[in-house]
């Protein structure tokens, strides 16, 4: 297994510059990461720069709060795909989940899945803000809505992926969906812990450091 292909090389800071985007694109080409994950404003450029490579372009929808309307998330998804996005990481309506308005949460996800038109959709449930029951419910709603992945975190809510959350999410979705761990995965040890817990994709800005750690530890 090429572990670089488990990494979405990520740059989602609001002050990301073109120079920084160029850096992660070049790193993704060099290390053969699964994707670069960038804000929608950078999707078209990233897509142009990665044309003819195996590196996918991933973007975020309703990010980071999940509090835009379903119609906006749907339009944002279509626009991103028109600009070259191949994977979509969307944030759920967290408040609706906490209110118990589960139909709204599911409909919100379904709208993005439909707008994505067959592209991979990863659903960010923002674990740090949820109870255990809410985490389980969010995973169940994501599955019912036809998503492909559940994802732990935006990295903008004061906490990221934990081994416990990844295990819980994987136990909930089984082999029917995949789990993406993101937020705070900074080194090889974090990476290995998340994969062992059941994640099959890692979102990280530290992709290069992770792979360099992998390369330096190839003896065992």
Swiss-Prot record:
It is an enzyme of class 4 (lyase). Its main location: cytoplasm. The keyword Disulfide bond does not apply. Disulfide bonds: none annotated. It is found in: Cytoplasm. It catalyses: 2-deoxy-D-ribose 5-phosphate = D-glyceraldehyde 3-phosphate + acetaldehyde. GO terms for biological process: 2-deoxyribose 1-phosphate catabolic process; carbohydrate catabolic process; deoxyribonucleotide catabolic process. CDD domains: DeoC (cd00959). The active site is at 89 (proton donor/acceptor), 151 (schiff-base intermediate with acetaldehyde), 180 (proton donor/acceptor). Keywords: Cytoplasm, Lyase, Schiff base. The keyword Nucleotidyltransferase does not apply. Its EC number is 4.1.2.4. Gene3D superfamilies: Aldolase class I. It holds the Pfam family DeoC. InterPro entries: Aldolase_TIM, DeoC, DeoC/FbaB/LacD_aldolase, DeoC_typeI. Pathway: Carbohydrate degradation; 2-deoxy-D-ribose 1-phosphate degradation; D-glyceraldehyde 3-phosphate and acetaldehyde from 2-deoxy-alpha-D-ribose 1-phosphate: step 2/2. One of its GO terms (cellular component) is cytoplasm. GO terms for molecular function: deoxyribose-phosphate aldolase activity. It comes from the Bacteria. Belongs to the DeoC/FbaB aldolase family. DeoC type 1 subfamily. PANTHER family: DEOXYRIBOSE-PHOSPHATE ALDOLASE (PTHR10889:SF1). Catalyzes a reversible aldol reaction between acetaldehyde and D-glyceraldehyde 3-phosphate to generate 2-deoxy-D-ribose 5-phosphate. This is Deoxyribose-phosphate aldolase. The gene is deoC.
């Amino acid at each position: 297994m090429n572990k670089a292909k488990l990494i979405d090389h990520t740059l989602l800071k609001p002050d990301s510059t073109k120079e920084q985007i160029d850096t992660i694109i070049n790193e993704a080409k060099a290390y053969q990461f699964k994707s670069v994950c960038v804000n929608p404003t950078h999707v078209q450029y990233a897509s142009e720069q990665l044309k003819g490579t195996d590196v996918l372009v991933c973007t975020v929808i309703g990010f980071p709060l999940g509090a835009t309307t379903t119609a906006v998330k749907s339009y944002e998804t279509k626009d991103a795909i028109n600009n070259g996005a191949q994977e979509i990481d969307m944030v759920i309506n967290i408040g609706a989940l906490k209110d118990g308005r589960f139909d709204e949460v599911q409909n919100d996800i379904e709208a993005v899945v439909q707008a994505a038109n067959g592209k991979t959709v990863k659903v960010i449930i923002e674990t740090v803000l949820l109870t255990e029951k809410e985490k389980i419910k969010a995973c169940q709603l994501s599955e019912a809505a036809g998503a492909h992945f559940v994802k732990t975190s935006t990295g903008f809510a004061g906490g990221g992926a934990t081994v416990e959350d990844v295990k819980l999410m994987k136990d909930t979705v089984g082999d029917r969906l995949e789990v993406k761990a993101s937020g705070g995965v900074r080194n090889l040890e974090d990476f290995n812990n998340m994969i062992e817990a059941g994640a099959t994709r890692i979102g990280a800005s530290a992709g290069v450091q992770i792979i360099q750690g992998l390369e330096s530890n190839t003896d065992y």
